[in-house]
Structure formats: structure tokens, C-alpha cells
């Protein structure tokens, strides 16, 4: 078993083709019967330390990744509850704090593979959920999944038609394949985040929200300045499910103000 590669919903990245991580055991109704208990299950999960039985034929990096997976309580909880990836708990923890998903919410999930965030959105009562990815994604009960590129000029209108109106939440957990060079990796993920933000501006309803993965670094100041103009609140968060050694953060923007964005563009 090899580590899964990351994925995105845009074809403009020049790196290797993205392959969605192999989905964990999936369930039509993942998580606990009471959705408020989903994150608590992960927090209380405990694994006995497990070691690989054999390292034969595996590189050091593969051994390290496999050992990490075997001893990760979020991986164990995802398998037990039927989430497609441990990343589902990141969105659960973000939503526990910011209350972005509720009954009647229209949601677009950019770079949806393998479907964990889409599952969470449906489980938490969203009215309409559309997941978009360049690569095939197994169906998620209660959501629509399409293959496509979010940079396609026709995509914003297409997804709004599928939702039956503008989106209340655009979320992106997209990440490029990492190179190991911090500056390069940061620039790549910021390019995806900026593209997702531009897409969000085209599809969000007034008062809507935006979530995107970013890496810690210094080149996102222009993006943050634009977000602070277009949204009433912009915050960074590192959910507990995000690995401590990872430099990833999530930017949470709420209260979309399209008129402020229009004023800003006129004054530019």
C-alpha cells in the first residue's frame, strides 16, 4: 500500500496527475447517529501503538507513512464511522466552531475526492451539495458529484443551476502534490486557494462563507486583504485533526459582501 497523492479541482497545475486517496470504508450514513458526537468520537479515540510486520520492499518514506496511518486515532475513527478520509474530522471540527452548515445550506465542495467533506456536508443537513473534482469520485448519498475543472468559465453558472441558486458555502480542501521545498509548496497551494476564492466570488450568495486550505507562509497577504474587503470576518484555524507536524491551516471567511467587492474593483 502506497501513500495517497493529493488532488485538486483544477487542471492548471503543472505537477503530476493527482490521484484521490483510496477511500476508507464508506457508509451511506457515516458517523454517529447524533452528528454532534462525531468529533467527540475522534477526540476520545485511542490506538495501541502498532508497528509494521515487515518493511520488505518499502522505502523509508513509505514505512514512515504507513506507521503514521496505523497509529493515527483519526484514521481509526474514520474507518469505524464510515468516513472516506480522516480529513472529514477537520471539517467536523471547523463546523463545530463556526456553524457554517445547517438545514437549507447550499454547498460546493471543490476538489471533493475522495468525498469525506461532501459526506460531512450531507450528514450535517445541507439542502444541496455538489462535489467537483477532476477525477472520478464514488457517489455520495444525498449529494451530486461531477467531474470537471473549477476554472472552466462555464462552471460557476453550471453549479449554481445544480444548486438551484447561489451557494451559501464554498469549501476547498485542495492541495498540490508536495515537493518538499517549502517555498514552492506554499506557492502552489496558495495558487489553488486564490483560484478557489475567485470561484467563490462568482457563486456565493450575500452573507455566504468560504473555507480553504492554506500553508503557513508570507505570500498570502494580498489574498487576505481581498478577503477582508469581501467578507465581514476572516480567521485562520488549525483544527485538532490537522497533524501537528503539518504546516496547513484553514482560512474561514464569513459574511460575504459582494457590494464591497464591487466597490473595491471600481476603485482599483
UniProtKB/Swiss-Prot annotation:
This is Ribosomal RNA large subunit methyltransferase E. InterPro entries: RNA_methyltr_RlmE, RNA_MeTrfase_FtsJ_dom, rRNA-MeTfrase_E, SAM-dependent_MTases_sf. It comes from Gluconobacter oxydans (strain 621H). Residues 26-52 have a biased composition (Polar residues). Its EC number is 2.1.1.166. S-adenosyl-L-methionine binds at residues 115, 117, 133, 149, 173. HAMAP family: RNA_methyltr_E. The keyword Methyltransferase applies. The active site is at residue 213. GO terms for molecular function: rRNA (uridine-2'-O-)-methyltransferase activity. Residues 1-60 are annotated as: Disordered. It is an enzyme of class 2 (transferase). Gene3D superfamilies: Vaccinia Virus protein VP39. It catalyses: uridine(2552) in 23S rRNA + S-adenosyl-L-methionine = 2'-O-methyluridine(2552) in 23S rRNA + S-adenosyl-L-homocysteine + H(+). It is found in: Cytoplasm. Keywords: Cytoplasm, Methyltransferase, rRNA processing, S-adenosyl-L-methionine, Transferase. Specifically methylates the uridine in position 2552 of 23S rRNA at the 2'-O position of the ribose in the fully assembled 50S ribosomal subunit. Pfam families: FtsJ. GO terms for cellular component: cytoplasm. Belongs to the class I-like SAM-binding methyltransferase superfamily. RNA methyltransferase RlmE family.
Amino acid at each position: 500500500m502506497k501513500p495517497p497523492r493529493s488532488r485538486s479541482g483544477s487542471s492548471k497545475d503543472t505537477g503530476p496527475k493527482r490521484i484521490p486517496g483510496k477511500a476508507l470504508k464508506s457508509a451511506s450514513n457515516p458517523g454517529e447517529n447524533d452528528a454532534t458526537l462525531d468529533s467527540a468520537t475522534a477526540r476520545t479515540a485511542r490506538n495501541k501503538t502498532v508497528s509494521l510486520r515487515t518493511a520488505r520492499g518499502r522505502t523509508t518514506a513509505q514505512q514512515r507513512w504507513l506507521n503514521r496511518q496505523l497509529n493515527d486515532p483519526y484514521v481509526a475513527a474514520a474507518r469505524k464511522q464510515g468516513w472516506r478520509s480522516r480529513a472529514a474530522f477537520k471539517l467536523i471540527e471547523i463546523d463545530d466552531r463556526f456553524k457554517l452548515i445547517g438545514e437549507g445550506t447550499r454547498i460546493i465542495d471543490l476538489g471533493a475526492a475522495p468525498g469525506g467533506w461532501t459526506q460531512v456536508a450531507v450528514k450535517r443537513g445541507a439542502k444541496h451539495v455538489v462535489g467537483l473534482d477532476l477525477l472520478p469520485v464514488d457517489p455520495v448519498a444525498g449529494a451530486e458529484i461531477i467531474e470537471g475543472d473549477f476554472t472552466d468559465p462555464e462552471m460557476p453558472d453550471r453549479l449554481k443551476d445544480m444548486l438551484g441558486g447561489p451557494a451559501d458555502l464554498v469549501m476547498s480542501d485542495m492541495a498540490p502534490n508536495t515537493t518538499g521545498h517549502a517555498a514552492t509548496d506554499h506557492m502552489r497551494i496558495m495558487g489553488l486557494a486564490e483560484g478557489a476564492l475567485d470561484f467563490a466570488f462568482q457563486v456565493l450568495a450575500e452573507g455566504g462563507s468560504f473555507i480553504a486550505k492554506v500553508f503557513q507562509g508570507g505570500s498570502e497577504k494580498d489574498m487576505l486583504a481581498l478577503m477582508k474587503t469581501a467578507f465581514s470576518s476572516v480567521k485562520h484555524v488549525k483544527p485538532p485533526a490537522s497533524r501537528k507536524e503539518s504546516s496547513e491551516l484553514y482560512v474561514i471567511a464569513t459574511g460575504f459582501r459582494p457590494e464591497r467587492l464591487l466597490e473595491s474593483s471600481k476603485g482599483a
